[in-house]
């Protein structure tokens, strides 16, 4: 079994969250805010149901491709009072799917969710389908 960690490389088709740069960083793209490994930059959503998707790096070429699932991992926290929740998001073709609610804490913590099947047809993931899909987050 092989696990590949692939990062966002561009904003996807769903861009409802706001990138929050600090100081004079200019207009930071959402994908840059989540990929720079810096807590000073982030994305946030003021309302429930907002979606942000990202184009991720392509899978390395596989001799005998077999994808048993896609694990979406995010570093997240809540920033205001009350219950903070998000959902993992995958967009594949004209179909999308979200995970169950992920409860957030006040401190940054790694969260992950698993998409075992491609929502576009409810079929096993293929290399081509993965490379064409977008992954992200929905405010809950």
Feature names for model-found ranges:
Residues 1-140:
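Disulfide-rich extracellular domains of secreted proteins
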């Amino acid at each position: 079994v092989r696990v590949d960690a692939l990062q966002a490389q561009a904003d996807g088709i769903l861009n409802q969250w706001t990138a929050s740069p600090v100081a004079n960083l200019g207009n930071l793209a959402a994908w840059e805010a989540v990929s720079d490994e810096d807590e000073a930059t982030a994305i946030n959503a003021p309302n429930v149901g907002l979606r942000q998707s990202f184009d991720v790096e392509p899978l390395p070429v596989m001799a005998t491709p077999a994808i048993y699932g896609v694990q979406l991992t995010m570093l997240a926290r809540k920033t205001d009072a009350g219950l903070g929740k998000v959902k993992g998001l995958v967009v594949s073709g004209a179909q999308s799917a979200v995970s169950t609610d992920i409860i957030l804490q006040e401190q940054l913590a790694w969260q992950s969710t698993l998409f075992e099947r491609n929502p576009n047809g409810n079929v096993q993931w293929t290399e081509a389908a993965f490379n064409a899909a977008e992954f992200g987050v929905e405010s809950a």
